[in-house]
Curated annotation (Swiss-Prot):
Catalyzes the attachment of isoleucine to tRNA(Ile). As IleRS can inadvertently accommodate and process structurally similar amino acids such as valine, to avoid such errors it has two additional distinct tRNA(Ile)-dependent editing activities. One activity is designated as 'pretransfer' editing and involves the hydrolysis of activated Val-AMP. The other activity is designated 'posttransfer' editing and involves deacylation of mischarged Val-tRNA(Ile). It comes from the Bacteria. A motif ('HIGH' region) lies at residues 58-68. The keyword Membrane does not apply. This is Isoleucine--tRNA ligase. A motif ('KMSKS' region) lies at residues 602-606. The keyword Aminoacyl-tRNA synthetase applies. It is an enzyme of class 6 (ligase). Belongs to the class-I aminoacyl-tRNA synthetase family. IleS type 1 subfamily. Keywords: Aminoacyl-tRNA synthetase, ATP-binding, Cytoplasm, Ligase, Metal-binding, Nucleotide-binding, Protein biosynthesis, Zinc. It catalyses: tRNA(Ile) + L-isoleucine + ATP = L-isoleucyl-tRNA(Ile) + AMP + diphosphate. L-isoleucyl-5'-AMP binds at residue 561. Binds 1 zinc ion per subunit.
Length: 936
C-alpha cells in the first residue's frame, strides 16, 4: 500500500503538548523581567483612561497562604482584563508592616528587654523587609504583574510621615476624641495585650447568681399584669467575675427575648424573679426551687429603663438593651460593667453610661473602693460573695471550670480594664451619617455587602485608634497637663513631626525633646507615646498612596478583598477618607468568601487539610492555581482540595490542547497572504468566526462585571462543545486532506486564525503564563507579549442571519444525536469507527430545512462516510427515534472500501487505476486542483 503521508497537511507545531508548568513558568517570568513587561505596558497605555484597583496590603509576616494567593490572583485577573480593554491599569502592591505579630517574632528571636526601643524598632523593620521579600517572590511566581520594584510599605519613612499628615487632617477636621476603652490587661506585664498575645486556658472561677432589686416593684409587677401584690421583685444576673460587681453600671436584656415574671420563695421569703422564659426551669433548678409560678410574658424591650438597686453600693442602675445577651447560660439578664468588658463597653456607650474603673495597672482595686480597696481583683471575689450572701442578694454560688484568657508570657489570668485611648468619634461632625450616605453611592459586589457594611457602621462604637506598643506609627500629640486639651496648634506641629519622620523614621518622634517644638510651653504639655492601630495605617492608603503617586488616582475604581474586610479595611478606609476629604476612597467594592476545604472547613494543621500555594505551584503550576481561582464562585465560601485542583488541572489540559490544535494547523498560514475574504469563506467557517465573535462579547462583558466563573465556563464549553466536539472535529478532514493552499483549507485556517487571536486574549488574564507562551507561537508579526495588546477586534463581518444561526444550532443538536447513536453501535460491536458507517436521517420539515442545503457535505458534518436525508414519515423499519423531536436515524455499515488517505469508505475507491486505493476526492486533493467546499 502506498504511503500518502507526504500528501497530507498533518498538524505540526513546536508548542509543547505537555505543559510542564513548574519548569516552564519561571522561564516566562524571566522573559517578562528581561522585557521589563510591566513598564512596557505602562508606556503603551500612557494617556489612556485610568482604571485603578487598589491593593489592600497583606501583613508582612509569613509566606503567602492560599487565601492571599486567591486574593492576588483575582486582582491580577481584573487588572489584566482592564489592560486588554485599553485602560491604563497600573497595579501598585503594598504591605502592612507594623503591629504585634512582627513584634512577637522579633521578641522571640532577640528579646525585647535586651534592646533599646530604637534598636527594637529597627529589628522589626528588618524582619518585615525579610517577610516582604518572601511574599513578593510568591506573588510574582503566581504571574501577578505589578510595580514590584516600587511597592508601598506602611513602614517607609515617607508613608509613616504621610500617615501623620492624614491624622493631622482628621484632627483639624475635629474627628479625634480621647476616652476610655476596656482592653485585655496583664497585671504581671503592667500593660495591655492584643488578641494575638492572649491564650485560653481552663480556670476555676466562682459562678454566682446575684439579685438586683427593682426600685419600683409595683410598676414592674403591673407591667407583667400582676396586681394587688406587695412582694419584692429581683432581676438575677449570673457572672463568673464577682470582682467586677463594684464597676456595675447596668443590667442588659435582649430586646427580642421573651421574659417571664416568676413567683417563688427564696431564703424563706416570697419573691418575684424576672428571667428569660427559656431559662426559667434551669435557673429555678439551680436555686433549688421546685414550686414556682410563671406570670406574664414580656419582650426584653419592654423592660428598658427599669431602675434597679445595686446589690451593695449606693447606686441605681438601669436595665438596658443589648444584642449580646443569649440564652446559652445564666438568666437572660447580663451584669454590665463597661470598664471590664468590650460588649459591656459598647452597649453602655449607646446609653452614655459612666466608665467606672476601680482597678489599677497592677490589677488591684484602688484604695477607696468599698470593701475591697487595695486587694488583687481575684482575691476580692471571696469577700464580695460573703457580702452578697449576708445581704440576701446571693441566689446561688458554685465553682466552675471554664476557658479563660491568660497572658501568653506569664500564663496568668487576664482582666479587662478600661484605659485612656484615642478614638475617631463616629458621631462627631456627623461622621456616621455621612458614612452611611456614602455607602449608598458605592457599588457593592455582591450587592448584600452594602447592607452588611451599612449595619456595621450604623452600630459601631467610636474607633479606638491608639495602641500602647513599640512598633508602630506614633500619635504625635501634646496634651495640656492640667486641662487635658490638645495643643491648639496640633495640626501644624504634626506637620513638623511628619517632616522629621520623613528623614529619620518614627524614632524622630520618640526621641524628640518637646522643647524643640514647644519651647517654654513644653513644661505644660505631656507628649503622647501611643502608636496608631495598624488598621489606621492601612486605612489611609487612599491618602498616602492613591493621592500621592502620580500613576494612581482617588477614588480608586475598585477595592477587592475578603468579606471580613467589611469590618476591617473597607471600613477603616471609608471612615478615614470621609474624615479627611468627605468622600469614599472607592467607587466599587468586591468581596469574596473564605477559602475552605471541600467540606467547608477552615484550613488547619490539626485537620491536616492545609494546602500551600507554593506546593500547588511546584506540583501543578501557577496557571492551574489561577484557573482554580477563576472557576470558583467567590460570592460564597471558596472550596479547595487536591481533588478540586485535579479538576482544574484537567480543565487546563483541555484549554491547552485546544490551543495546540489551533497552532498546529496554522504552521503554514501567513495572515497577510493567506486570509480568505469573508464572502469566500466556507459556511461552517463563517459560523465559527461569528460564534467566536459573539462569545467574545459575552466574555468581555463578564470580565467587566467580574463574573470569572462565567468566563471559565464559557471558555471550557467553547473548548469542549462548540469547538472541541463540533467545529474542530469537523474541519480536521479539510485541514489534513484538502489541497495545501486550496480555498477549503485556507478558509478553515482563516477561521482558526481569528479564533486563536481571540482565544489567546480571553485566557490571558486567567492563565497568563500559558497565554503568553501561546502568543510566542502565533503566526504573523506581533508585539512581544499578549499583554501589550487589546481584545482582538479585527474580525471580518461574518454576521449570520437569525435563520442561519438557527440552522447551525439545529445541526449541533442533530450531530449530537448521531454521535450518541454511533457510540452505542460502536459499544455493541456493530461498527468500528464512525467512518465505517452510513447514516440515513429521517427528518421532519423543520429539521429538513436546516440540513437539506448541505447536500453531499452533510457527511463531513457528521464525520461519516455517507449521509442522506429522507422525510420523517418515510422511516424504514430499521430506523429508530432520537431524543430530538422530528429526527429518526438508520445506521448501516458501509460496504465500500476504505480510502487509504482520508479513511472514508467511498464507492469511488478503486475507480481510478493510477490510485486504486484512493477515493476521487483524495486524488483531486493530492494530485490535481483539489476539491471545493461550500458548507463544511
Amino acid at each position: 500500500m502506498t504511503d500518502y503521508k507526504d500528501t497530507l497537511n498533518l498538524p505540526q507545531t513546536d508548542f509543547p503538548m505537555r505543559a510542564n508548568l513548574p519548569e516552564r513558568e519561571p522561564q516566562t517570568l524571566a522573559r517578562w523581567q528581561t522585557l521589563d513587561l510591566y513598564r512596557k505596558i505602562r508606556k503603551d497605555r500612557e494617556g489612556q483612561p485610568k482604571f485603578i484597583l487598589h491593593d489592600g496590603p497583606p501583613y508582612a509576616n509569613g509566606r503567602a497562604h492560599l487565601g492571599t494567593a486567591f486574593n492576588k490572583t483575582l486582582k491580577d485577573i481584573v487588572v489584566k482584563s482592564k489592560t486588554l480593554s485599553g485602560f491604563d491599569a497600573p497595579f501598585v502592591p503594598g504591605w502592612d508592616c507594623h503591629g504585634l505579630p512582627i513584634e512577637l517574632n522579633v521578641e522571640k528571636k532577640l528579646g525585647k528587654d535586651k534592646l533599646s526601643a530604637n534598636a527594637f524598632r529597627q529589628a522589626c523593620r528588618d524582619y518585615a523587609f525579610s517577610q516582604i521579600e518572601l511574599q513578593r517572590d510568591d506573588f510574582q511566581r503566581l504571574g501577578v504583574l505589578g510595580d514590584w520594584q516600587h511597592p508601598y510599605l506602611t513602614m517607609d519613612f515617607g508613608y509613616e510621615a504621610d500617615t501623620v499628615r492624614a491624622l493631622a487632617k482628621i484632627v483639624a477636621n475635629g474627628h479625634l476624641l480621647r476616652g476610655q476603652k476596656p482592653v485585655h490587661w496583664c497585671a504581671a506585664c503592667g500593660s495591655a495585650l492584643a488578641e494575638a498575645e492572649v491564650e485560653y486556658r481552663d480556670k476555676a472561677s466562682p459562678a454566682v447568681d446575684v439579685g438586683f432589686e427593682a426600685v419600683d416593684a409595683e410598676a414592674v409587677r403591673q407591667r407583667f399584669g400582676v396586681k394587688n401584690a406587695t412582694t419584692r421583685v429581683l432581676v438575677p444576673i449570673w457572672t463568673t467575675t464577682p470582682w467586677t460587681l463594684p464597676a456595675n453600671e447596668a443590667v442588659s436584656v435582649h430586646p427580642e427575648l421573651h421574659y417571664a415574671l416568676v413567683k417563688s420563695e427564696l431564703q424563706n421569703q416570697p419573691v418575684y424573679l424576672i428571667l428569660a422564659k427559656d431559662l426559667v426551669d434551669s435557673a429555678m433548678q439551680r436555686y433549688g426551687v421546685d414550686d414556682y409560678e410563671v406570670h406574664g410574658n414580656l419582650k426584653g424591650d419592654a423592660l428598658e429603663g427599669m431602675q434597679l438597686q445595686h446589690p451593695f453600693l449606693d447606686r441605681i442602675v438601669p436595665i438596658i438593651l443589648g444584642e449580646h445577651v443569649t440564652t446559652e447560660a445564666g438568666t437572660g439578664n447580663v451584669h454590665t460593667a463597661p470598664a471590664h468588658g468590650l460588649e459591656d463597653y459598647f452597649v453602655a456607650e449607646k446609653y452614655n453610661l459612666p466608665i467606672n474603673n476601680p482597678v489599677d495597672a497592677r490589677g488591684r482595686f484602688i484604695p477607696d473602693t468599698f470593701l475591697v480597696g487595695g486587694q488583687p481583683v481575684f482575691k476580692a471575689n471571696e469577700p464580695i460573695i460573703v457580702l452578697l450572701a449576708d445581704s440576701g442578694h446571693l441566689l446561688h454560688s458554685e465553682t466552675i471550670q471554664h476557658s479563660y484568657p491568660h497572658c501568653w508570657r506569664h500564663k496568668t489570668p487576664l482582666i479587662f480594664r478600661a484605659t485612656p485611648q484615642w478614638f475617631i468619634g463616629m458621631n462627631k461632625n456627623g461622621l456616621r451619617e455621612r458614612a452611611l450616605a456614602e455607602i449608598e453611592k458605592v457599588t457593592w459586589l455582591p450587592a448584600w455587602g452594602e447592607a452588611r457594611i451599612g449595619k456595621m457602621v450604623a452600630d459601631r462604637p467610636d474607633w479606638c485608634i491608639s495602641r500602647q506598643r513599640l512598633w508602630g506609627i506614633p500619635i504625635p500629640l501634646f496634651i495640656h497637663k492640667k486641662s487635658g486639651e490638645l495643643h491648639p496648634k496640633s495640626p501644624a506641629l504634626m506637620e513638623k513631626v511628619a517632616q522629621l519622620i520623613e528623614k529619620e523614621s518614627v524614632d524622630a518622634w520618640f526621641d524628640l525633646d518637646p522643647k524643640v517644638l514647644l519651647g517654654d510651653d513644653a513644661d505644660h504639655y505631656e507628649k503622647v507615646t501611643d502608636v496608631l492601630d495598624v488598621w489606621f495605617d492601612s486605612g489611609v492608603t487612599h491618602f498616602c498612596v492613591l493621592e500621592k503617586r502620580r500613576e494612581l488616582k482617588v477614588p480608586a475604581d475598585i477595592y477587592l478583598e475578603g468579606s471580613d474586610q467589611h469590618r476591617g479595611w473597607f471600613q477603616s478606609s471609608l471612615l478615614t477618607s470621609l474624615a479627611i476629604r468627605d468622600k469614599a476612597p472607592y467607587k466599587s467594592v468586591l468581596t469574596y468568601g473564605f477559602v475552605v476545604d471541600s467540606q467547608g472547613r477552615k484550613m488547619s494543621k490539626s485537620l491536616g487539610n492545609v494546602i500551600l500555594p507554593a506546593d500547588v505551584v511546584k506540583n501543578l503550576g501557577a496557571d492551574v492555581l489561577r484557573l482554580w481561582a477563576a472557576s470558583m464562585d467567590y460570592t460564597v465560601e471558596v472550596n479547595v482540595s487536591d481533588e478540586i485542583l485535579k479538576r482544574a488541572s484537567d480543565a487546563y489540559r483541555r484549554i491547552r490542547n485546544t490551543a495546540r490544535f489551533l497552532l498546529s494547523n496554522l504552521y503554514d498560514f501567513d495572515p497577510k497572504k493567506d486570509k480568505v475574504a469573508v464572502d469566500q469563506l466556507v459556511a461552517l467557517d463563517r459560523w465559527a468566526i461569528f460564534t467566536t465573535q459573539k462569545l467574545q462579547e459575552k466574555i468581555i462583558t463578564a470580565y467587566d462585571r467580574y463574573r470569572f466563573p462565567a468566563i471559565y465556563q464559557a471558555i471550557h464549553n467553547f473548548c469542549t462543545v462548540e469547538m472541541g466536539s463540533f467545529y474542530l472535529d469537523i474541519i480536521k478532514d479539510r485541514l489534513y486532506t484538502s489541497k495545501e493552499s486550496g480555498l477549503p483549507r485556507r478558509s478553515a485556517q482563516t477561521a482558526l486564525y481569528y479564533i486563536a487571536e481571540a482565544f489567546v486574549r480571553w485566557i490571558a488574564p486567567i492563565i497568563s503564563f500559558t497565554a503568553d507562551e501561546i502568543w510566542q507561537f502565533m503566526p504573523g508579526d506581533r508585539e512581544p507579549s499578549v499583554f501589550l495588546t487589546q481584545w482582538f477586534s479585527d474580525f471580518p463581518n461574518a454576521a449570520l442571519s437569525g435563520e442561519e444561526e438557527q440552522r447551525w444550532q439545529l445541526l449541533l443538536q442533530i450531530r449530537d444525536e448521531v454521535n450518541k447513536a454511533l457510540e452505542t453501535y460502536r459499544n455493541e460491536g456493530k461498527i468500528g469507527s464512525a467512518l465505517t458507517a452510513e447514516v440515513v436521517l429521517y427528518a421532519d420539515e423543520r429539521l429538513n430545512a436546516a440540513i437539506a442545503t448541505l447536500g453531499e457535505e452533510l457527511r463531513f458534518v457528521l464525520i461519516t462516510s455517507e449521509a442522506s436525508v429522507l422525510p420523517f414519515n418515510e422511516k424504514s423499519k430499521a430506523a429508530f427515534d432520537t431524543a430530538l423531536p422530528g429526527l429518526a436515524l438508520e445506521i448501516n455499515v458501509s460496504e465500500f472500501e476504505k480510502c487509504a488517505r482520508c479513511w472514508q469508505r467511498r464507492s469511488s475507491v478503486g475507480q481510478i487505476k493510477e490510485h486504486a486505493d484512493l477515493c476521487d476526492r483524495c486524488v483531486s486533493n493530492a494530485f490535481e486542483d483539489g476539491d471545493m467546499r461550500q458548507f463544511a
